[in-house]
C-alpha cells in the first residue's frame, strides 16, 4: 500500500501539476499559478518544507531575473551563473538531508555517496565555467559550459526525487526512485541538446520552473499533517 502511494500518488499528482499549465493561456498566468499554489501550501507546511518551497520559488525568480533560457532558446548574452549556482546549492542541500535522514536504507549506499559527490563536483565545475564565460567569447569555454550543464540536469533529478519523497527518504526503494529521476532528467538534457527548439517551448509553458516547484507541493501538504505516505 505504501509503495503504491509513494510511486503512484506522488507521481500522478506531480504530472497533473504540469497538465494544469497547458490549460492556462498566458505565461504570466502560468507563473502566477505556480507561485500562488506554492504560497498557499507554504502557509500550512512545516518549517523544512517552507524553506524548500521558498527555494524552488527562488529558482524560478532567478530564471526570470537572468533569463538565459528564453522562448527563443539559449541566450549566451545573459548570465547563467546564478541559476547553475542555485542548482548546485539545491543538490547539496538534498544530499545533506538524505545523508542525515534517520534510519535511511539504501541498497547501494557506497555507490550513492560516490555518485553524489561526483555530481556535486561536476556541478561546481559548471558553476566555475559559467562565471568564466561572462563577457567571454572563447568558444572552447562556452562548449565546456554547455556540456557540463548535464550536471545541472542531474541536480534537477536529484531535487525532484528528494522533494517527492521528502517524508519517506528512509524507504527501501528510495535509491531506485532517485536513480529513476536522475535518469529522466538527464534524458531530458539530451533531448534539449538534439532538439533545441524544445527549450523555447518549455520556457513558454514554464516547464523549467515547474519541475522544481510542483514536486514540493505533495510533501508540503503531507508535512503539515505529519503523515508518512
Swiss-Prot record:
Domain of life: Viruses
Coiled coil, from the record: none
Keyword Oxidoreductase among record annotations: no
Localization (cell): Membrane
Alphabetical keyword list: Membrane, Transmembrane, Transmembrane helix
Lipid bilayer topology: Multi-pass membrane protein
Protein family membership: Belongs to the mimivirus L68/R809 family.
Name the UniProt record assigns to this protein: Uncharacterized protein R809
Organism: Acanthamoeba polyphaga mimivirus
Amino acid at each position: 500500500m505504501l509503495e503504491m502511494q509513494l510511486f503512484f500518488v506522488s507521481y500522478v499528482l506531480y504530472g497533473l501539476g504540469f497538465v494544469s499549465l497547458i490549460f492556462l493561456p498566458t505565461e504570466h498566468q502560468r507563473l502566477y499559478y505556480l507561485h500562488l499554489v506554492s504560497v498557499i501550501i507554504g502557509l500550512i507546511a512545516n518549517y523544512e518544507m517552507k524553506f524548500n518551497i521558498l527555494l524552488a520559488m527562488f529558482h524560478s525568480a532567478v530564471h526570470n531575473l537572468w533569463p538565459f533560457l528564453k522562448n527563443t532558446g539559449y541566450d549566451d548574452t545573459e548570465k547563467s551563473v546564478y541559476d547553475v549556482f542555485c542548482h548546485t546549492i539545491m543538490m547539496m542541500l538534498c544530499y545533506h538531508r538524505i545523508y542525515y535522514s534517520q534510519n535511511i536504507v539504501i541498497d547501494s549506499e557506497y555507490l550513492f555517496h560516490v555518485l553524489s559527490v561526483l555530481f556535486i563536483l561536476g556541478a561546481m565545475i559548471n558553476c566555475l565555467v559559467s562565471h568564466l564565460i561572462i563577457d567571454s567569447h572563447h568558444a572552447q569555454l562556452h562548449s565546456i559550459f554547455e556540456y557540463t550543464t548535464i550536471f545541472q540536469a542531474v541536480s534537477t533529478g536529484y531535487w525532484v526525487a528528494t522533494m517527492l519523497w521528502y517524508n519517506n527518504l528512509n524507504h527501501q526503494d528510495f535509491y531506485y526512485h532517485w536513480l529513476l529521476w536522475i535518469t529522466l532528467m538527464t534524458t531530458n538534457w539530451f533531448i534539449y541538446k538534439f532538439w533545441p527548439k524544445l527549450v523555447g517551448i518549455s520556457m513558454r509553458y514554464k516547464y523549467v520552473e515547474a519541475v522544481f516547484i510542483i514536486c514540493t507541493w505533495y510533501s508540503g501538504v503531507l508535512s503539515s499533517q505529519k503523515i508518512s505516505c
